[in-house]
């Protein structure tokens, strides 16, 4: 369930990082109505782009989508160019695409800024769906929209890890659910269908701001608390805990960017270990915790030994699926590219060197 779709070593910034959008209670219903009326939905975007351009956009290549929309003025195409591709659109076209909110309203919400006679998005806003629900998710602009590596405070939108977790999560009705590392609230959108109360936590104030906006945009009640891992919910128990935590194994050497969405600041696979050892204290009897993670496999060891060590004394029953194994070079390449640093750049080689020597 929840088959969601969406279409250097120095500190990376895009100049001043754009402010997060505001959950204005007067303007959000207008935005919601305009997006729906424009068919700015997963299926609507697919129809605008066609399968080739939509597939390329999913692989973070925007040229085919640019070609498919460049000379179109229909509402859905204008919104794709504005919010998914990051191109400026004419102010008048934006007014026609958002007839209730208008371009001025998009600026007031913090979704866009004026750029001469054009409107340019300051965040990514895309449709998202599962088998029975449709939503919209705002997040920071991706590197394909900005042309720059990600800022360390970057807040992710809809990604493969998020949709994988959503597909695997047990969807039985629960009283209390915890979305640990809430990010842009993708998991909370799914939880709203079967949880009476949802608590979302994140160490990033920027992520919490996006979660607050997305909850309001999608008419979702969500309790948000700031803090690291399970610290903000000390003494609380839940029927279901879900988490796509910042699990990337990152070198703790100086100068390596610390992307908040993927790096918890712990050594090695410490974030996964901490969750395994502590999450049982926060589960109701019969409760379930489901999360993704990366872990180290020591040379010559069975990968299950590490999990047996972590689980010892927790009282938990565990089902651990090792989906993939990567050697150090493969792992370094994956996560050096993930921040938007391109192969061949000096910063890529430096990042690669740091990761491969973890």
Regions found by a protein language model. Name each.
Residues 356-358:
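Conserved small/polar residues in nucleotide/adenosyl-binding loops
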Residues 268-321:
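Conserved Class I SAM-dependent methyltransferase catalytic core
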């Amino acid at each position: 369930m929840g088959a969601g779709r969406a279409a250097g070593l120095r500190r990376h910034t895009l100049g001043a990082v754009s402010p997060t959008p505001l959950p204005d209670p007067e303007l959000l219903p207008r935005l919601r109505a305009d997006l729906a009326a424009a068919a700015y939905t997963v299926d609507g975007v697919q129809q605008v782009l066609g399968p080739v351009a939509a597939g390329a956009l999913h692989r973070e290549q925007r040229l085919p989508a640019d070609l498919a929309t460049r000379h179109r003025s229909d509402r859905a195409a204008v919104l794709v160019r504005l919010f998914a591709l990051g191109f400026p659109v004419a102010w008048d076209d934006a007014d026609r695409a958002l007839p209730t909110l208008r371009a001025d309203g998009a600026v007031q919400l913090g979704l866009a800024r004026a750029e001469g006679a054009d409107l340019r998005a300051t965040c990514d806003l895309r449709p998202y769906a599962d088998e029975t629900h449709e939503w919209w998710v705002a997040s920071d602009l991706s590197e394909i929209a900005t042309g720059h590596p990600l800022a360390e405070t970057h807040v992710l939108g809809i990604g493969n890890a998020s949709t994988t977790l959503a597909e695997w999560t047990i969807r039985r009705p629960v009283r209390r659910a915890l979305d640990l590392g809430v990010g842009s609230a993708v998991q909370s959108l799914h939880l709203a269908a079967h949880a009476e109360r949802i608590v979302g936590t994140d160490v990033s104030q920027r992520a919490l701001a996006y979660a607050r906006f997305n909850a309001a945009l999608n008419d979702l009640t969500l309790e948000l608390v700031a803090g690291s891992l399970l610290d903000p919910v000390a003494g609380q128990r839940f029927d279901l805990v879900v988490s796509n935590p910042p699990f990337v194994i990152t070198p703790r050497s100086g100068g390596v960017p610390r992307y908040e969405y993927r790096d918890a600041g712990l050594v090695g696979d410490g974030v996964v270990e901490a969750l395994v050892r502590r999450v049982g204290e926060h589960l109701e009897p019969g409760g379930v915790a489901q999360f993704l993670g990366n872990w180290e496999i020591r040379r010559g060891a069975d990968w299950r030994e590490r999990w047996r060590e972590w689980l010892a004394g927790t009282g938990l029953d565990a089902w651990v699926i090792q989906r993939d194994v990567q050697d150090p070079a493969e792992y370094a390449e994956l996560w050096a590219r993930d921040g938007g640093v391109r192969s061949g750049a000096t910063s890529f080689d430096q990042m690669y060197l740091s990761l491969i020597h973890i």
